[in-house]
């Protein structure tokens, strides 16, 4: 998974330049690059989260997630700062060189992190084999569990909104306020800094405040961030925009830790991989939806209105509505009810037991 992600990162800037020279060849290269990244991300994420669930224990999951995402956001901030310097002054060669360096650094750190992460024993191998689940099994496990279905949709809406803005904030800053490449690159650093602060806050609240309460606070913070960013486009104010970025960062950090901790709780002992795999499917679908919102829909609205800014504002507005729907759904998610429903035999199993 890591190797596929690195290949996608290194090839992606070349795809952007190739599209302007040979459109169809660029599309083909784009399918390869982003397909490799997507497959690599999902291969890595599901196994990584399953391992984190098993190693952390129920009481330490919030702190484990806080540490995981703390390190991830630190790397995002460091990468954003490094990229802003490596591409200044901007040239296509500088951009490709910067992406190559990021890819090599990620591969090196990732391989070092894998050393002794999961000692292999025969028992481990047998358990890994026993926990190989099909897509059909994951689908059945979720569809027969009402709380599971609600959480699947909730996670989809939440992540699609939060992840969908990832590719929009920087070009929006350039379009709405005329920010330079260096200035827009630093938007990620600002956002990441407040995500980092929020992760530390969420980690400190672990065990002191109910997870759903913390998750709802994060969801509402991110929702407020989107609304303020939309407002900044109408009033043409960079100070309002940066306020929205700050709120979005704080909300994203709190929501990330608390919702992932909640996701880890929504598993059943002995079938952790089954449910983490199902939540991974929701994550993958949310990334697809976020990409469609950030790319296809934005371009479609821009073409219809003739104004590039309108495309961004419409997408941010839709993402705010998705977060609002997620806020309403969170109250229906109960861990105890989920586990009771997960452990209850399916209808076919009940018939078989009755026949015996």
Indicate residue ranges for each PLM-predicted region.
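C-terminal ends and interior cores of transmembrane alpha-helices
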Residues: 1-24, 220-236
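Helix-to-loop junctions at the C-terminal end of transmembrane segments
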Residues: 87, 198-213
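Short amphipathic helix-loop junctions that connect adjacent transmembrane helices
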Residues: 167-184, 299
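C-terminal transmembrane helical hairpin of 12-TM major facilitator-type secondary transporters
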Residues: 213-259
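Cytoplasmic membrane-interface "Motif A"-like loop-to-helix N-cap segments
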Residues: 1-4, 207-220, 307
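A membrane-interface helix-boundary motif in multi-pass transporters
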Residues: 20-25, 84-104, 296-323
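Juxtamembrane intracellular "pre-TM" segments in multi-pass secondary transporters
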Residues: 121-152, 341-356
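Glycine-rich segments within core transmembrane alpha-helices of 12-TM secondary carriers
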Residues: 62-87, 280-293
């Amino acid at each position: 998974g890591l190797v596929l992600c690195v290949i996608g990162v290194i090839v992606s800037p070349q795809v952007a330049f190739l599209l302007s020279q040979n459109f169809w060849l660029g599309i083909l290269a784009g399918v390869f690059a982003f397909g490799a990244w997507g497959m690599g991300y999902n291969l890595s994420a599901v196994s990584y989260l399953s391992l984190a669930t098993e190693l952390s224990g129920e009481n330490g999951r919030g702190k484990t997630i806080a540490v995981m995402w703390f390190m991830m956001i630190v790397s995002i901030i460091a990468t954003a700062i490094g990229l802003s310097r490596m591409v200044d002054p901007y040239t296509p060669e500088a951009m490709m060189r910067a992406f190559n360096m990021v890819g090599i650094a990620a591969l090196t750190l990732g391989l070092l992190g894998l050393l002794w992460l999961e000692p292999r024993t025969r028992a481990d191998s047998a358990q890994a084999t026993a926990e190989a689940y099909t897509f059909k099994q994951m689908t059945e496990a979720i569809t027969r569990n009402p709380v599971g279905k609600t959480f699947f949709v909730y996670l989809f809406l939440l992540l699609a909104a939060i992840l969908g803005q990832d590719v929009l904030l920087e070009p929006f800053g350039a379009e709405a306020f005329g920010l330079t490449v260096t200035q827009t690159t630093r938007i990620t650093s600002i956002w990441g800094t407040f995500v980092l602060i929020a992760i530390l806050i969420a980690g400190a609240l672990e065990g002191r405040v109910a997870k759903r309460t913390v998750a709802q606070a994060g969801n509402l913070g991110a929702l407020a961030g989107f609304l303020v960013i939309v407002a900044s486009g109408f009033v043409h104010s960079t100070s309002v925009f940066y306020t929205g970025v700050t709120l979005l960062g704080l909300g994203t950090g709190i929501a990330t830790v608390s919702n992932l901790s909640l996701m880890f709780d929504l598993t059943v002992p002995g079938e952790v991989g089954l449910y983490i795999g199902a939540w991974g499917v929701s994550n993958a679908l949310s990334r697809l939806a976020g990409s469609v919102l950030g790319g296809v829909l934005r371009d479609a609205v821009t073409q219809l209105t003739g104004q590039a800014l309108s495309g961004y504002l419409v997408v941010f507005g839709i993402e705010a509505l998705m977060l609002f729907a997620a806020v309403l759904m969170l109250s229906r998610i109960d861990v105890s009810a989920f586990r009771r429903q997960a452990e209850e035999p399916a209808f076919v199993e009940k018939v078989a037991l009755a026949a015996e």
